[in-house]
Every structure is written in C-alpha cells, then in structure tokens.
C-alpha cells in the first residue's frame, strides 16, 4: 500500500548506521532527509485511444536520483492491471535536471460513457554508497549523513497525480457540469451525487460555513463526506471544483435536502 503523507504519497525507509549496542552512548545523533521529485502537471487528461501523452519530471536535489514511475489503480493500493506503459520506467536524473515521461495506452477496455481514474506515481530513489550508478564521490557525499549520525531516516516521497482517462465520446468539460451536483444530509454525512460522466474534483467545500475535507466524486456516482459536530440545522453547501488545468473554478452554492 502507498502511505499517505501530507499532500503527497510517501514510502518511508529506515537506515541505521552501526554503533556498539553495549557501549555508553551519552547522545545519539539523529538525521533525516526527504527525497522527492516534482511533476510538471497537477493532473493528466488522457484522451482514450490516444497514442500517448508527455509529462515532465524534475530532480530538485543537488545530487542524482533514480526516477521510478508506475501507474496505480484508482484506490492507489496496487499497480493498475490496465495496460498503460510509462517510458522510461526507471532512469537516472542528474541534480537539478529535468526530463520527460511518455505515458501510452497499450490496449485494455475502458468505459466509453464516463471517465476512468488511474494514478501516475513518480519516486526519486536516492543513491547509496554501494550504488554503481553513482560514479561521483562528491554526489555520494552530498547524500550520505555525517559519520557521527547514529540514526538516519530516509523519506522517499512517491509523488502521485491523477491520470484521468477521458473517452472521445464525452462532450464538454467538468466545469460545465459542476453546478449539477446535488447534496443531502443523511446519517451525519453530507452526500454528494454527481450525475455527470466526469470526475468532480472538489477543491473547496463548506457546509454551514465550516470547511469540509475535499475529495473527488466519481462520475455517475456519489460520495459521502464526514460532517463535523455542531452543524445541526445547517443547510447551505458551497463548493469549487478543480478544472482540467489544476485551477479552482467559480463558487457554487445550494441548500441541501434534509
């Protein structure tokens, strides 16, 4: 499973430098580093049956990293069984450099009447002393902790963005259907219904003036948002969706069905 860490997805690995267990250790020095890469887009709209799309990745570190890219299913718990190919799947990216990934559909069956959701996850793998792909001692020194560090914790950040597979049969964009969301309160939850064929990616959501953690609403489906306490009698819900470019659309507001 990919662990959720703040606004990105992270995989945590631990490395301990050796020290004598039976010797006196008045102080154990701890150190930690995060290793991540940036993706040039906040989401990818993949036209179904397209030959492929390109997305850029950048190494923000001051030493080289290995870039590993994978496609995961909607719940992000396993690699997608649908035939998407990312090339190159694994490569070295030097310090402060940028490169491109190509994502291509290689078959598979997708619904033609609504979008499908996958995730592109890109991870920067830091070098270790024994790695032969790091041929520069200076780069290794930049990565490795001081010799007096007793415990060294590594955070290899797995940065994921939505890969929205959009059939050519769909007309329009999500923002043209955003106001059609319907809302009701049931069992202490705020239920949103999305009748459109598009994923509605909620960027901002308030109910009774209080902010609600946002989430996407699948096409032709519903999503239940947990409500905080103290909202008895509240009726007004306001929301903004995230558009195809990653920006917030206009504000919509309705009274819920009780």
Curated annotation (Swiss-Prot):
Listed PANTHER family: CHAPERONE PROTEIN CAF1M, PILUS ASSEMBLY CHAPERONE
Cysteines paired by S-S bonds: 121-160
Protein name: Chaperone protein caf1M
InterPro entries (alphabetical): Ig-like_fold (IPR013783), PapD-like_sf (IPR008962), Periplasmic_pilus_chap (IPR050643), Pili_assmbl_chap_C_dom_sf (IPR036316), Pili_assmbl_chaperone_bac (IPR001829), Pili_assmbl_chaperone_C (IPR016148), Pili_assmbl_chaperone_CS (IPR018046), Pili_assmbl_chaperone_N (IPR016147)
Organism for this UniProt entry: Yersinia pestis
GO MF annotation: an example: protein folding chaperone
Signal peptide as annotated in the record: 1-20
Biological classification of the source: Bacteria, Pseudomonadati, Pseudomonadota, Gammaproteobacteria, Enterobacterales
Protein family membership: Belongs to the periplasmic pilus chaperone family.
Metal-binding recorded as keyword: no
Annotated function: Has a stimulatory role for the envelope antigen F1 secretion. It seems to interact with the subunit polypeptide and to prevent it from digestion by a protease.
UniProt keywords, alphabetically: Chaperone, Disulfide bond, Immunoglobulin domain, Periplasm, Plasmid, Signal
Annotated SUPFAM superfamilies: PapD-like (SSF49354), Periplasmic chaperone C-domain (SSF49584)
Domain of life of the native organism: Bacteria
Subcellular localization, as worded in the UniProt entry: Periplasm
GO biological process: cell wall organization; chaperone-mediated protein folding
Gene Ontology terms: cellular component: outer membrane-bounded periplasmic space
Keyword Disulfide bond: yes
